[in-house]
């Protein structure tokens, strides 16, 4: 109770002090007013008794009121002036932001990124297909043909360091861009790390520019870096090109196509891009109905490089914290990457496709791509005459040769040669890039591992054996062969076949035709003649155990009993 009275007393005192302050202000104001009227007052009141001033009356009344309030039990309520809460929070946040921007987190960034624990090969591992079940061999009969489709399980493991650029990722694959080393990166869909950055120097390797080839970009965003590169290129055209064109540096790779994951690993390009532009029929390839080769020509006009940082924090504004980077996805499982260089030029993809079942298809395609004159090679020439070719150009003056489909490979050669020089009319296009780990500047190579089924098809044509006996003796034949088929598990099924007239005696002249199916193998031809000699009644004239299947196998025997002659020729 005493505490309550004490509190009331002090509340009254506080209230009275406030009132006193207000009265003091009023008194001061009255005093000023009285001063101004002093002269007139003195003139009119010289013979009158002085009256108390109004300010004195006010003070007297206020003092009496204060005494009454001190002796009262009533609470004095003060209404404090309220500040808007929203305004206060804004001021507080503004203050915090300013403080944060002035803080230097360089050491923290370096320590945290250097302490990230990861395996470069594992975080960028791309595991493609795993092959478990497949039919190793399959036989298909078509009219007088027998097609053997053979499948073999293969592995491919590549670690390319230059990654193909597609339109959808150019805004996150520019020089000095920051990325995450995660699954998206391995699939050519990198995740960008966007945050406040320090200025960044970039360099273009166009000849003759000297120191002018290096510029500093204050805020290295995609837009700012692209503008800086455009300015450098225009500067080269205006001042250093001498009106001359710049020949491209060409990189060339080729591979037969067996599966999507295999061609991605072999050429380091997204199979969706190839499929969308070239129209690869993977289904027909897996069935052995088509054979396809893809060649990729990278024609590089120039490369733009970003200066590598000495320490990870060099690329960030000092206000950036490691928590900021964590919110962007940086972790042990997804360490940060830095795009160190980008190659600009154009890419030409060429598809060579045939339905030929020849085992020389790959060799014929390679010879054509390398510019070898295949017309002198009958086998290669036949394959190319029954092939189609498609070329797609990305970059440069692509409008001229956007997509070309032809039966004449010379047209494809012209597409590759045309516009292979850099000029204003034939501009460069970002075609590939290389990234490094921000922690140590090690090159980030995608570790492609995939299994695939290599499908080859061999076509066999039915044939026949032409027997001709012109010898002066009695002859006998033994004709044997196997017919090959495959069950639904790909296991070879062999059926033994023989000529119905084996071991029957034949006198000259004699001739007949024995038809052979397209699936005939292991052909054996034996012919013998009767000598009439007691110690050698039968003598072999022909005994061939590995006769190859041909359209016509001509077996001729002639001569006498003591001097027989035999031959096998093919047609």
UniProtKB/Swiss-Prot annotation:
<feature type="transmembrane region" description="Beta stranded">
    <location>
        <begin position="375"/>
        <end position="387"/>
    </location>
</feature>
<dbReference type="GO" id="GO:0031640">
    <property type="term" value="P:killing of cells of another organism"/>
</dbReference>
<feature type="short sequence motif" description="Cholesterol binding">
    <location>
        <position position="561"/>
    </location>
</feature>
<keyword id="KW-0472">Membrane</keyword>
<keyword id="KW-0204">Cytolysis</keyword>
<dbReference type="GO" id="GO:0005576">
    <property type="term" value="C:extracellular region"/>
</dbReference>
<comment type="subunit">
    <text>Homooligomeric pore complex of 35 to 50 subunits; when inserted in the host membrane.</text>
</comment>
<protein>
    <recommendedName>
        <fullName>Streptolysin O</fullName>
    </recommendedName>
</protein>
<dbReference type="Pfam" id="PF17440">
    <property type="entry name" value="Thiol_cytolys_C"/>
</dbReference>
<comment type="similarity">
    <text>Belongs to the cholesterol-dependent cytolysin family.</text>
</comment>
<feature type="transmembrane region" description="Beta stranded">
    <location>
        <begin position="358"/>
        <end position="367"/>
    </location>
</feature>
<feature type="transmembrane region" description="Beta stranded">
    <location>
        <begin position="280"/>
        <end position="289"/>
    </location>
</feature>
<keyword id="KW-0800">Toxin</keyword>
<keyword id="KW-0732">Signal</keyword>
<feature type="transmembrane region" description="Beta stranded">
    <location>
        <begin position="260"/>
        <end position="273"/>
    </location>
</feature>
<keyword id="KW-0812">Transmembrane</keyword>
<dbReference type="InterPro" id="IPR001869">
    <property type="entry name" value="Thiol_cytolysin"/>
</dbReference>
<feature type="region of interest" description="Disordered">
    <location>
        <begin position="81"/>
        <end position="108"/>
    </location>
</feature>
<dbReference type="InterPro" id="IPR035390">
    <property type="entry name" value="Thiol_cytolys_C"/>
</dbReference>
<dbReference type="GO" id="GO:0090729">
    <property type="term" value="F:toxin activity"/>
</dbReference>
<feature type="compositionally biased region" description="Low complexity">
    <location>
        <begin position="37"/>
        <end position="48"/>
    </location>
</feature>
<keyword id="KW-0354">Hemolysis</keyword>
<dbReference type="InterPro" id="IPR036363">
    <property type="entry name" value="Thiol_cytolysin_ab_sf"/>
</dbReference>
<dbReference type="GO" id="GO:0015485">
    <property type="term" value="F:cholesterol binding"/>
</dbReference>
<dbReference type="InterPro" id="IPR036359">
    <property type="entry name" value="Thiol_cytolysin_sf"/>
</dbReference>
<keyword id="KW-1134">Transmembrane beta strand</keyword>
<keyword id="KW-1032">Host cell membrane</keyword>
<keyword id="KW-0446">Lipid-binding</keyword>
<feature type="short sequence motif" description="Conserved undecapeptide">
    <location>
        <begin position="529"/>
        <end position="539"/>
    </location>
</feature>
<feature type="signal peptide">
    <location>
        <begin position="1"/>
        <end position="33"/>
    </location>
</feature>
<feature type="region of interest" description="Disordered">
    <location>
        <begin position="32"/>
        <end position="56"/>
    </location>
</feature>
<keyword id="KW-0843">Virulence</keyword>
<keyword id="KW-1043">Host membrane</keyword>
<comment type="function">
    <text>A cholesterol-dependent toxin that causes cytolysis by forming pores in cholesterol containing host membranes. After binding to target membranes, the protein undergoes a major conformation change, leading to its insertion in the host membrane and formation of an oligomeric pore complex. Cholesterol is required for binding to host membranes, membrane insertion and pore formation; cholesterol binding is mediated by a Thr-Leu pair in the C-terminus. Can be reversibly inactivated by oxidation.</text>
</comment>
<dbReference type="GO" id="GO:0020002">
    <property type="term" value="C:host cell plasma membrane"/>
</dbReference>
<keyword id="KW-0964">Secreted</keyword>
<dbReference type="GO" id="GO:0016020">
    <property type="term" value="C:membrane"/>
</dbReference>
<dbReference type="InterPro" id="IPR038700">
    <property type="entry name" value="Thiol_cytolys_C_sf"/>
</dbReference>
<dbReference type="Pfam" id="PF01289">
    <property type="entry name" value="Thiol_cytolysin"/>
</dbReference>
């Amino acid at each position: 109770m005493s505490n309550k009275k004490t509190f009331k007393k002090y509340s009254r005192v506080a209230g009275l002090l406030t009132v006193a302050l207000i009265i003091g202000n009023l008194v001061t104001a009255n005093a000023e007013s009285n001063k101004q009227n002093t002269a007139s007052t003195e003139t009119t009141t010289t013979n009158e008794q002085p009256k108390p001033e109004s300010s004195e009356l006010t003070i007297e009344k206020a003092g009496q009121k204060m005494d009454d309030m001190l002796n009262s039990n009533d609470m004095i309520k003060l209404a404090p002036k309220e500040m808007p809460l929203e305004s206060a929070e804004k001021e507080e946040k503004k203050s915090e932001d300013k403080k944060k921007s002035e803080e230097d987190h360089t050491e923290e960034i370096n320590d945290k990124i250097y302490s990230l624990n990861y395996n470069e090969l594992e975080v960028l591992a791309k595991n493609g297909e795993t092959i478990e079940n497949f039919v190793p061999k399959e036989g298909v009969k078509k009219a007088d043909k027998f097609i053997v489709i053979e499948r073999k399980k293969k592995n491919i493991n590549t670690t390319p360091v230059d990654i193909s650029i597609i339109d959808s990722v150019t805004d996150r694959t520019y020089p000095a861009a920051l990325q995450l080393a995660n699954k998206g990166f391995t699939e050519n869909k990198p995740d960008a790390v966007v945050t406040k950055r320090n200025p960044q120097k970039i360099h273009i390797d166009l000849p003759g520019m000297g120191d002018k080839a290096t510029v500093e970009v204050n805020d290295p965003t995609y837009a700012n870096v692209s503008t800086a590169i455009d300015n450098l290129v225009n500067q080269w055209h205006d001042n250093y090109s001498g009106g001359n064109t710049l020949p491209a540096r060409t990189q060339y790779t080729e591979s037969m196509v067996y599966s999507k994951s295999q061609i991605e690993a072999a050429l380091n390009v997204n199979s969706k891009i190839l499929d969308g532009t070239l129209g690869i029929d993977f289904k027909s390839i897996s069935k052995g109905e088509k054979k396809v080769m893809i060649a990729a020509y990278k024609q590089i006009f120039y490369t733009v490089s970003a200066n590598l940082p000495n320490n990870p924090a060099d690329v960030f504004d000092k206000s950036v914290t490691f928590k900021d980077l964590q919110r962007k996805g940086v972790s042990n499982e997804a360490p940060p990457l830095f795009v160190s260089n980008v190659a600009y030029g154009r890419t030409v993809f060429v598809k060579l496709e045939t339905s030929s079942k020849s085992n020389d298809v790959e060799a014929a395609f390679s010879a054509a791509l390398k510019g070898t004159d295949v017309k002198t090679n009958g086998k290669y020439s036949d394959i190319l005459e029954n092939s189609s070719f498609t070329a797609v150009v990305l970059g440069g003056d692509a409008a001229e040769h956007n997509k070309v489909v032809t039966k004449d490979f010379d047209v494809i050669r012209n597409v590759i040669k045309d516009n292979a020089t850099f000029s204003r009319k034939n501009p460069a296009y970002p075609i590939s890039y290389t990234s490094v780990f921000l922690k140590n500047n090690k090159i980030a190579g995608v570790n492609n591992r995939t299994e695939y089924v290599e499908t080859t098809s061999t076509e066999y044509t039915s044939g026949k054996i032409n027997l001709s006996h012109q010898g002066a003796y009695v002859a006998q034949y033994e004709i044997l062969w196997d017919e090959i088929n495959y069950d639904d598990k790909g296991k070879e099924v062999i059926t033994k076949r023989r000529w119905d007239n084996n071991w029957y005696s034949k006198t000259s002249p004699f001739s007949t035709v024995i038809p052979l199916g397209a699936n005939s193998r292991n052909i054996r031809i034996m012919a013998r003649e009767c000598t009439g000699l007691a110690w050698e009644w039968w003598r072999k004239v022909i005994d061939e155990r590995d006769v190859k299947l041909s359209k016509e196998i001509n077996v001729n025997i002639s001569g006498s009993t003591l001097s027989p002659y035999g031959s096998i020729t093919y047609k």
